[in-house]
A protein has these predicted regions:
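Alpha/beta-hydrolase active-site loop
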Residues: 38, 48, 68-89
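N-terminal cap/lid subdomain of alpha/beta-hydrolase-fold enzymes
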Residues: 1-69, 351
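Alpha/beta-hydrolase fold nucleophile elbow
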Residues: 93-105
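Alpha/beta-hydrolase fold catalytic core
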Residues: 194-341
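Short alpha-helix in the alpha/beta-hydrolase fold that links the catalytic acid
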Residues: 328, 342-352
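Glycine-rich nucleophile elbow surrounding the catalytic serine of serine-hydrolase chemistry
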Residues: 102-115
Length: 404
């Protein structure tokens, strides 16, 4: 997708008109963002090919470039690294501390970009910022790992919708998440790894505990062989309460399906809500604030298929970049109610970047009581920008030598 989300809702000097929780309001438009990090950093928003106004163009002979030059994990990283080099050189910013930030798939992108910049462009960074990162290495791992690390998200979303047992519901969210995390790693993951070798007794014990932490019934958990898809969770959590579905990217949002029956929601209520307000805001902003007019459509999402997912070494790339650059630090920002790139999946991914734990003091994790775009909730817009500001200040070298 385009960089529109962070451009006019998070770090930029203008933000779109939404209410305190992030829902659309009319009239559409934008206003000043008093929380922008423009006071500590110059911000460059980049729209990859086929997003925003970025397009492939023909060469002098009228021949279009091949899609494989842009549409793939490694191709994407390679051309964007070249772009960053060109931009930095044109604007004479080689001496400046540099940070790259990526949201969702952008998390995969900047993990790989950190190493590509160092290895191919000889450009060393001070920080990598992951906002609700999507780690595709994790999604392609064995199902027991992915299923287990989703449980704490189930707990968070169920707590928000008051669907947990009272012993949990009466506690604060941050009191109950650590025990859900501990159960997911130390009990649920080993149990799921057993597959058909698990005993009936253990299967029932696990199903009961999963029900306790998720708000789902023990019956449906057993029907799924203990591995409940997130899509089913979004459909089922409130099925017998209000008949509504909950959002994928932000489970605070509610949807209305044609039928209460089924295994997955008809649509993503949070995404329709966001497009409702973001699309008019960015088009209005570009024309009236930036004074740029064109008949080219601003692509909120672009067609980048077929996307080459082969040879995804971005996680190892980030580790290598950190190992070879003592300055480099990482900040992760995740929303507890994000059901697509869950907060605990992000924690787990960071643990796999540095399994030795030797660089753990260079990782910072920040969680927020919102979803994928935590900055849409005004309280978290303030907090998340303050966290960015602190990270930038703390990771600037300030005369310190880059050495171990």
């Amino acid at each position: 997708s385009a960089s529109v989300w962070m451009h006019i809702a998070y770090t930029g000097p203008r933000i779109l008109n939404i209410d305190e929780e992030g829902y659309p309001t009319q009239p559409y438009g934008f206003r000043s963002n008093p929380n922008s990090i423009i006071d500590v950093a110059d911000i460059v928003f980049v729209n990859p090919v086929n997003t925003g106004y970025s397009r492939m163009v023909a060469d002098k002979e009228g021949k279009m470039p091949e899609k494989k030059l842009f549409f793939g994990i490694n191709a994407d990283i390679k051309y964007l690294a070249e772009w960053v080099n060109t931009f930095v050189s044109r604007h004479n910013r080689w001496e400046s501390p540099k940070y790259i930030i990526g949201e969702s798939y952008g998390g995969t992108r900047v993990m790989g970009l950190s190493n590509e910049l160092q290895n191919s462009q000889w450009m060393y960074l001070n920080g990598v910022i992951l906002v609700s990162p999507a780690d595709y290495n994790l999604y392609s791992t064995g199902q027991p790992i992915y299923s287990a690390i989703n449980l704490p998200y189930f707990t968070a979303a169920a707590w928000y919708h008051k669907a947990l047992p009272s012993v949990l519901q009466n506690k604060d969210l941050l009191e109950i998440l650590p025990e859900a995390e501990e159960y997911a790693i130390n009990t649920l993951m080993p149990a799921l790894a057993k597959g058909g070798f698990i005993s009936d007794e253990e299967r029932n014990e696990v199903a009961e505990k999963m029900s306790y932490y998720s708000g789902l019934s023990k019956k449906v958990i057993l029907q799924h062989n203990l591995e409940v898809p997130t899509s089913f969770f979004w459909k089922d959590l409130l099925r017998d309460k209000t008949g509504q579905t909950i959002g994928r990217l932000d489970s605070r949002y509610l949807g209305l399906d044609k039928m209460e029956a089924g295994t997955r929601p008809d649509y993503s209520p949070e995404l329709t809500s966001w497009l409702h307000s973001f699309t008019p805001a960015i088009n209005h902003y570009i024309k009236t604030e930036l004074n740029f007019s064109t008949d080219i459509k601003y692509n909120m999402f672009g067609n980048v298929n077929p996307w080459d997912r082969r040879n995804n070494n971005t996680r190892d790339g980030l580790r290598e970049a950190m190992a070879t650059n003592p300055y480099l630090k990482v900040l992760n920002q995740s929303g507890y109610y994000d059901g697509a790139t869950t907060y605990f999946a992000a924690k787990y991914s960071l643990s796999q970047v540095d399994p030795s734990g030797k660089m753990k003091d260079r990782f910072t994790f920040k969680g927020y009581r919102s979803g994928h775009m935590m900055y849409l909730r005004n309280e978290d817009l303030i907090k998340a920008n303050d966290d960015l500001r602190s990270f930038i200040k703390e990771s600037s070298a300030n005369g310190k030598s880059a050495k171990y």
